[in-house]
Amino acid sequence: HSDAIFTDNYSRFRKQMAVKKYLNSVLT
């Protein structure tokens, strides 16, 4: 169970980082 929670949080974190990177590339 803890692995599933960790993976879920990790994928969500990765998505947030990808979105930030995308926004940065669009805004600059």
UniProtKB/Swiss-Prot annotation:
Residue runs in coiled coils: none
Transmembrane spans: none
Listed Pfam families: Hormone_2
Cellular localization per UniProt: Secreted
Keyword terms: Amidation, Hormone, Secreted
Gene symbol of the encoding locus: vip
Threonine amide PTM positions: T28
Any GO BP: regulation of protein localization
Entry annotated with the keyword Chloroplast: no
Protein name: Vasoactive intestinal peptide
Taxonomic path: Eukaryota, Metazoa, Chordata, Craniata, Vertebrata
Entries under InterPro entries matching the protein: Glucagon_GIP_secretin_VIP, VIP/GHRH-like
Record-stated family: Belongs to the glucagon family.
GO molecular function, one term: peptide hormone receptor binding
